[in-house]
Amino acid sequence: MLSLAAALAVDAVELKVNCERPDSWKIVTEKSVSGDVEEYEFRLSSPTAAVPPRFDVTFDVPQLDAHHKWTTQTEKVTMPPNWSCHTSSRLCASMPLVAFLNDNDRNRICVSASEAMRFVGFEAGLREEDCRIVWKVTFFSEPEAPLSAYSVKLRIDRRDVFFGDAIREGTEWIVRSAGLRPTVPPPAAFEPLYSAWYSFHQDVSDKAIEAECAEAAKLGMKVLIVDDGWQTDDNNRGYAYTGDWEMSKRRFPDMAAHVKKVHALGMKYMIWYGVPMMGLKAKNYERFKGKYLWTSNSRWSGYSCLDPRFPEVREYLISLYEKALREWDLDGLKLDFIDAIGFHGTDPAIGENYAGRDLKALPAAVDRLMKDVFARLKAIKPDVLIEFRQGYIGPAIRQYGNMMRAADCPGDLLANRARTANLRLTSGGTAVHADMLEWHRDERPEAAARYVLSTMFSTIQYSVMLRTYPESHKRMIAHWLKFSRDHRDALLHGSFRPHHYEAFYPWMEAENAAERIVGVYVGGTVVPVDAAAKPNYVLNGTGEGVVFVDSATAATAEVLDTFGAPAGSVSLAKGLNKVVLPVSGYLKVR
């Protein structure tokens, strides 16, 4: 590739723009600086509409007190070499932001791109020859429809600030630069819910769901999601029977009456759809032949991916969702597998000269589909709930949904904690949900509560078969549901700061004007408390019967166990204190 632009300074570092076709495309670069934040705008133009060229922006910076790479895609937090450091983003996968941090929660460099729709490749890793972090940000490396003009911005933030602030501000910069309008979530998006996935998998039925909801409602859960299985009599997993989206009459003989019974318990009702899926055994499969992006017939797939560039594909899907809301009186939908919409190699539309497609660019078609879905469902139910799953969690996705759930991590409290914390940093005001909680019924309630405490700074989804679990587990769940409700403003809407990404967040905190809540998850971690201005709560998610607190003042603390029952009190001296605290219990410091 040929260098198009003269070198631009990033401090003492050269920034270069490289383009595949500099003879037919002109690139103009503009730079603005505000303190330690630099912005670059790259404007491409061509005399006639043409497939845009692949181009990239490269630069490097010295590795100075930078030790860990932060992205939304990986939980590998070490310093990668520059020969194995690729991440990427597009509308329905990840987001165009990468950062490097030090060991003390400080930002060292955070780079974000304004391209929230198309594929963006990020390579950022250490060059071993000279200990420099080498960057390459690539655009138009996937098939793209012809155009004659394009612009994109790059933001390079090298401020010495809390890393979470750099990531949050980089995210909101993308929102502004791309002209995005995230939805405002209704209150129900923050309500704890029951998910039928881990507890039932596909083996769902009206009577069993109603019995579970009766238990869930008594404990304080307000929303239900019925996942895969409602649309088929088959229990063999995979997605061969998706696409028709007709209710299984064996499982749910009268869906509207069933939903009414769940509503009577005080719970809202949502169901799952695999958005682009047309199962190979679906009745409608032949109807849409020639309108698929790709087909997979493996054990865990068995479907073709619909191409939303066809208007009849979009209308088919939207009409299904509208019908479900109207006929069954649903309150929302879990719209899954949007990240499957993409190319597996070449774009099939190119060889067909885009025949039948009213939109040529795939990201534009996904955007159109999801905007129309949200607008038309909202017209039926203004407070409609729409859940999306990590990794389609970028700023553009927030325009179409109001619940962002951590990617599947059954039984993995560490991954759930890290994923929800990362989502809190990038999701703005959108409701962040934990992956569904499950644990063995023979687990001690104090040990089971660690799953709850690890996700306390998100909206929690439970997915255990409540009817078969001990009463002690239900008492524990009920208490923490009440705690999360009583402290929701601080936990979910207050200032949130997760600490030490390199250790998967051994402690996190959130606060509002009235209170501060600290969760500690690794034994031996010292957490600061300062109850002079407001009450502090310290939640013991370590699995050990002690916590270490560094108190700004002498104070008195109530000790409570995992059921919320008083377990004594303790006097804290100013400075370091070793406090005996029940596993999954908590301190209330005043």
Regions found by a protein language model. Give the residues of each.
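Aromatic- and acidic-residue-enriched carbohydrate-binding clefts of CAZyme catalytic domains
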Residues: 230-255, 282-308, 340-367
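Active-site-proximal substrate-binding groove within the catalytic cores of carbohydrate-active enzymes
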Residues: 145-147, 151, 369-585
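N-terminal accessory beta-strand-rich subdomains and adjacent acidic, glycine-rich linkers
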Residues: 10-173, 180, 531-533, 548-550, ...
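An acidic-aromatic substrate-binding cleft motif
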Residues: 175-215, 219-223, 231-232
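Active-site-adjacent "subsite" loops/lids of carbohydrate-active enzymes
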Residues: 184, 191, 198-202, 268-327
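Active-site groove signature of glycoside hydrolases
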Residues: 220-230, 317-351
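Hydrophobic faces of well-ordered beta-strands that scaffold small-molecule active sites
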Residues: 190-196, 224-226, 269-273, 333-335, ...
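Glycine-rich, aromatic-flanked loop segments that form ligand/cofactor-binding clefts
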Residues: 165-181, 222-226, 250-301, 383-387, ...
